[in-house]
Regions:
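A generic local structural motif
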Residues: 71-73, 206-207, 252-256, 282-287
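Short beta-strand/turn micro-motifs composed of small residues
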Residues: 88-89, 222, 300
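Conserved RecA-like ASCE ATPase "motif II neighborhood" in helicase/translocase motors
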Residues: 266-302
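Conserved motor-coupling elements within RecA-like helicase/translocase cores
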Residues: 251-268, 289-290
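Short, solvent-exposed polar/charged micro-motifs at secondary-structure junctions
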Residues: 94-97, 254-259, 279
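Conserved helicase motor
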Residues: 225, 247-257, 272-277
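Preference for short coil/turn "hinge" residues that link or interrupt alpha-helices
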Residues: 149-150, 208, 220, 247, ...
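ATP-dependent helicase/translocase motor core
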Residues: 1-217, 226, 230-242, 267, ...
């Protein structure tokens, strides 16, 4: 039984529906039942919940209403499947991941959507066209949310993180399609400020590339060993249940992982120090040839 396939976007068995004024059964006999505004369904599953307010009403009221619904326990049963909340007025929009528990709602993670140049998009018609339509809505659920095991909450990417990760994975796909592996000038830079979520961006970029099959190895390269330990823990926390992130405790382990044909060795976290020692550690020419014949993407932290 296949319930959902994140790759079947506007294709295959994916079906999209709009649910108006869904009725929520109260979890307490002391509280009234509630009615929401709009839900977006994929294969019958309510994955987006949208709360609307009129012009002139602060968007914070829509956010608070969603928080209130969560506190009252209405997001249970099938409604526990809601992944992304959207609060909207005709002139303003905020979106945020469902944290599961109402106490975990955090205004710092309520985001506005923006275009590729980071210009905010707030008009409801553009939001409907650029964010809530297919394929974007399906992509956001399937590829640009992360279940973070470190704090037990769902995270959704900001718009600039989406554009960065998408651009990186698209670049690799283009190189593969054009058979340009081995040529020069195939890299690029993504500028992130402190606190802007570069770890999630780098992980999602690596994950998208690994899952696409456009590269044999994706190596997250850090410049300090202590950073590698933290990055490995972060990557492990972000990875899907069927994904494996490989650490490297020595240069020899790194060489083994790079040579491996096992799919579980695709995502690798290592340090510049270990990478620089590959030849110095007496790597034989046969091993180097095996590694050189692989399609390897390096994602460098704080380059």
């Amino acid at each position: 039984l296949k319930i959902y396939d994140r790759a079947e976007i506007a294709a295959g068995q994916s079906r999209y529906q709009i649910l108006r004024q869904p009725k929520f059964k109260s979890a307490s006999p002391m509280l009234n039942d509630r009615r929401g505004d709009i839900m977006l369904l994929i294969n019958g599953m309510p994955l987006f919940h949208i709360e609307l307010k009129n012009s002139g009403v602060p968007i914070s009221q829509a956010c608070e209403q969603i928080r209130k619904y969560s506190k009252e326990g209405i997001y249970n049963g099938i409604f526990a499947l809601v992944q992304i909340f959207v609060a909207m007025t005709p002139q303003k929009m905020l979106y945020f991941a469902n944290p599961g528990e109402w106490e975990k709602f955090n205004d710092n993670f309520f985001f506005s959507w923006a275009d590729f140049n980071n210009e905010p998009i707030n008009d409801y018609r553009q939001i409907a066209d650029k964010f809530l339509s297919i394929p974007m809505a399906h992509q956001m659920i399937g590829f640009y949310t992360i279940a973070d095991r470190s704090d037990g909450t769902l995270k959704v990417m900001r718009s600039y993180q989406y554009y960065a990760a998408s651009a990186i994975s698209s670049k690799v796909a283009k190189i593969t399609a054009q058979k340009r592996w081995g040529s020069e000038n195939r890299g690029g830079f993504i500028w992130h400020t402190t606190g802007s979520g570069k770890t999630i961006t780098s992980f999602k970029s690596a994950q998208l590339i690994a899952n696409s099959g456009d590269a044999d190895k994706v190596v997250f390269l850090i410049d300090r060993i202590e950073l590698g330990t933290q990055s490995f823990k972060n990557y492990q926390a972000f990875a899907d249940d069927d994904e494996s992130v490989q650490d490297t405790n020595s240069t020899r382990t790194l060489i083994t992982k790079l040579k491996s044909t096992n799919s579980s060795d695709t995502l690798i976290v290592t340090s510049i120090q270990k990478m620089s020692k590959i030849k110095a550690d007496g790597t034989n020419s046969h091993d180097l040839e095996i590694i050189n014949n692989k399609r390897v993407v390096f994602i460098v932290d704080e380059a």
